[in-house]
């Protein structure tokens, strides 16, 4: 079924594309976008903080963020409405200003003088509702701050291909990000038809440690997205993985169940896909920005919930730094941290101290040396990231102090001039 198209207020070519939906419920509601009753109180309190009632604003969810603009989805009279808004800092529940990210719920108002009978008015986001979760990933560069991925996510789905050989280190880093954000984590192994049954079983056993779910899908034939659809039903799930992992192919399959991904026409594809190189199985970047995609309602899929299923597709990640949250790393490597808790000294470095339970476990063969080495590297990288973040915060506060000091001196000189 072709993707549904709607009108929306924009004069920018980069936003003139199909709305990411293929199946239309009889009536759209905010629940279709992932809204549930617990959001109502937060929305009312946020509206009150803006000196208004909830009815004075439009409640919308951020579906995409571009360089200077963002796209919003809301519902009106049973229809799904796509709005355009300028990308500007918005006040959050802490009274601080920050940019909206994909998945945020925002209160907006129309900008006077925009819109007409054929398209909605352009909107201005005024406040961000308190986030339930906020997923970020550390930048691979030395100076950049953490990069936002999505907000209000229930589950992080790690999409990892079986060919070329899966990277357990990358999976562990994604898992730590999920734990740092307080969301569930699932592993979806794609291209399972490119390896033997024995290899596939081995991957499931070795890579599924600490996961809430492990699923396998075959990209080239017999593609059945039903297990994944059941996993994400009634949730907001973000797909993360490297280029060529099959994230966009999986999204298209979820939107067009029963359609062979190889035979799916371009007009039915919400997300573009690219082939991988035969030599090494590596892919190219196809998805270039984070995009929120609404699936058919959970009621239609048999989940028995009125809350809709929302997917967030993301560009492939080339390099992934460790999270700065050391407790999330401990949770990911729960076997290592359990041994570490039994060490004689609380500040044990697990190298040569007497009474080190970790070294004893390594000597006894109870702990995999390669896994411990990955844990050690992630912990060291996490410590460097925290130090870098502290240095960056110090520079920012120092610049703010210098700016305020200069402004104070200018004001003082101005007052002295008037006195003379």
Predicted regions and their residues:
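A short macromolecule-binding patch
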Residues: 78-88
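Conserved beta-strand/loop subsegment of P-loop NTPase cores
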Residues: 152-160, 180-192, 211-217
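Helix-rich effector regions associated with P-loop NTPase G domains
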Residues: 2-28, 53-56, 82, 94-105, ...
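Switch/coupling subdomain of P-loop NTPase systems
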Residues: 71-73, 101, 118-124, 144, ...
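Walker A/P-loop
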Residues: 243, 248, 253
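SH3/SH3-like beta-barrel fold
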Residues: 70-75, 108
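Structural detector for short beta-strands of small beta-barrel domains
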Residues: 56-68
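Canonical P-loop GTPase G-domain recognition
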Residues: 184, 193-245
């Amino acid at each position: 079924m072709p993707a549904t198209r709607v009108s929306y207020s924009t004069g920018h070519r980069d936003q003139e594309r199909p709305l990411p939906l293929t199946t239309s419920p009889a009536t759209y509601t905010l629940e279709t976008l992932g809204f549930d009753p617990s959001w109502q109180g937060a929305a009312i309190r946020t509206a009150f903080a803006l000196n208004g009632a909830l009815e004075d604003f439009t409640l919308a969810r951020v579906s995409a963020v571009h360089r200077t603009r963002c796209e919003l989805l809301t519902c009106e009279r049973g229809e799904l409405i796509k709005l355009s808004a300028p990308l500007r800092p918005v006040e959050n529940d802490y009274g601080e200003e920050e940019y909206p990210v994909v998945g945020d719920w925002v209160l907006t108002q129309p900008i006077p003088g925009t819109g007409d009978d054929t398209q909605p008015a352009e909107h201005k986001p005024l406040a961000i509702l308190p986030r339930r979760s906020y997923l970020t990933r550390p930048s691979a560069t030395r100076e950049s701050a953490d990069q936002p991925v999505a907000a209000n996510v229930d589950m992080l789905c790690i999409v990892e291909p079986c060919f070329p050989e899966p990277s357990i280190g990358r999976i562990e880093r994604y898992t730590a990000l999920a734990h740092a954000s307080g969301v569930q984590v699932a592993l979806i192994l794609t291209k399972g038809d490119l390896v033997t049954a024995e290899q596939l079983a081995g991957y499931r056993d070795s890579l599924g440690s600490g996961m809430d779910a492990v699923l396998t899908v075959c990209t080239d034939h017999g593609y059945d997205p039903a297990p994944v659809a059941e996993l994400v039903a009634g949730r907001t799930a973000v797909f993360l993985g490297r280029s060529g992992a099959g994230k966009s192919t999986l999204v298209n399959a979820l939107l067009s169940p029963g359609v062979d991904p190889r035979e799916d026409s371009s007009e039915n594809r919400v997300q573009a896909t690219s082939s991988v190189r035969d030599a090494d199985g590596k892919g190219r970047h196809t998805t270039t920005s984070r995009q929120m995609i609404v699936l058919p309602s959970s009621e239609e899929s048999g989940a028995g919930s009125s809350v809709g299923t929302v997917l967030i597709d993301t560009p492939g990640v080339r390099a992934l730094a460790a999270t700065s949250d050391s407790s999330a790393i401990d949770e990911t490597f729960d076997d290592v941290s359990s041994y570490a808790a039994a060490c004689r000294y609380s500040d044990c470095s697990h190298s040569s101290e007497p009474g080190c339970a970790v070294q004893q476990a390594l000597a006894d063969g109870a702990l995999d040396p390669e896994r411990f080495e990955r844990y050690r590297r992630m912990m060291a990288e996490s410590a460097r990231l925290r130090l870098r973040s502290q240095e960056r915060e110090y520079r920012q506060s120092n610049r703010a102090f210098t700016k305020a000091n200069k402004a104070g001196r200018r004001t003082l000189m101005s007052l002295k001039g008037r006195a003379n």
